[in-house]
């Protein structure tokens, strides 16, 4: 019991009341602190707070279902001392280890001693290997801090900003003369053909009433010059392209 010297608070769990005072006094003399008593059969009904004792001494330690509770009752690094146990020491030590105790051993006086870890049950600690290297993270950056950005204004010249002439975009316009190619696909062939038909229709337009030049008041309902101002007799008048075409 000398190994428990200096422990301030002890719980003594007893089974036999004979000479109980002597056994308790022995523990008190060895530790030099306070000793509380609890019957082994009343342990499951007790309501001790967590981390209440520095040492727990048990007689006849067949308490398989209560080792976890004893672990909670001990303070961090608290001691568990089993005396007068029944059965193989190896099996009992295995049960104590599985309950969360560490440094489990058999003493020379046919007793078993175990220790609670130096931290409270359910506590957490930061792990050093979880730190991330900032330089390693920068390797995967798409843009570095020293990369220069291109000025958007330098990408286009003044000539690029000028809108092109739609007529100059045609393939046929490269000849310098408004003449459609053999396999024209830019629409110039259709445009020239339309102008040709409009011109022919205008030249062949003849007045059936002879009053077309006088104005709309003297023109018939189908006059091609309807809507145009009056003109001199014999004067050539250019009609619009859509006047001689069907509306359908």
UniProtKB/Swiss-Prot annotation:
Short sequence motif Cx2C motif 1: positions: 209-212
Motif (Cx2C motif 2): 220-223
Region (N-terminal SAM-like domain): 4-129
Cofactor: [2Fe-2S] cluster; [4Fe-4S] cluster
Keywords, ordered alphabetically: 2Fe-2S, 4Fe-4S, Cytoplasm, Iron, Iron-sulfur, Metal-binding, Mitochondrion
Keyword 4Fe-4S applies: yes
Organism superkingdom: Eukaryota
Residues that bind [4Fe-4S] cluster: 209, 212, 220, 223
GO terms under biological process: iron-sulfur cluster assembly
Function recorded in the entry: Component of the cytosolic iron-sulfur (Fe-S) protein assembly (CIA) machinery. Required for the maturation of extramitochondrial Fe-S proteins. Part of an electron transfer chain functioning in an early step of cytosolic Fe-S biogenesis, facilitating the de novo assembly of a [4Fe-4S] cluster on the cytosolic Fe-S scaffold complex. Electrons are transferred from NADPH via a FAD- and FMN-containing diflavin oxidoreductase.
UniProt domain comment: The C-terminal domain binds 2 Fe-S clusters but is otherwise mostly in an intrinsically disordered conformation.
Binding partners and assembly: Monomer.
Name under which the protein is recorded: Anamorsin homolog
Source organism of the structure: Drosophila ananassae
């Amino acid at each position: 019991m000398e190994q428990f010297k200096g422990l301030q608070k002890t719980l003594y769990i007893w089974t036999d009341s004979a000479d109980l005072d002597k056994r308790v006094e022995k523990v008190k003399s060895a530790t030099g602190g306070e000793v509380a008593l609890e019957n082994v059969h009343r342990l499951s009904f007790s309501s001790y707070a967590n981390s209440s004792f520095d040492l727990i001494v048990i007689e006849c330690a067949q308490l398989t279902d209560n080792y976890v509770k004893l672990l909670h009752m001990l303070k961090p690094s608290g001691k568990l001392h089993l005396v007068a146990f029944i059965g193989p020491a190896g099996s009992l030590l295995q049960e104590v280890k599985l309950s969360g105790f560490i440094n489990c051993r058999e003493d020379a006086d046919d007793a078993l001693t175990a220790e609670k870890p130096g931290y409270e049950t359910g506590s957490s600690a930061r792990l050093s290997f979880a730190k991330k290297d900032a330089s390693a993270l920068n390797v995967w950056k798409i843009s570095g801090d020293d990369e220069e950005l291109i000025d958007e204004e330098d990408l286009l010249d003044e000539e690029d900003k000028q809108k092109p002439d739609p007529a100059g975009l045609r393939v046929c316009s490269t000849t310098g003369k408004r003449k459609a190619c053999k396999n024209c696909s830019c629409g110039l062939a259709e445009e020239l053909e339309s102008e040709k038909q409009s011109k022919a229709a205008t030249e062949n337009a003849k007045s059936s009433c002879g009053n077309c030049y006088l104005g709309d008041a003297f023109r018939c309902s189908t006059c091609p010059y309807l809507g145009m101002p009056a003109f001199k007799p014999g004067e050539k008048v250019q009609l619009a392209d859509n006047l001689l075409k069907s509306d359908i």
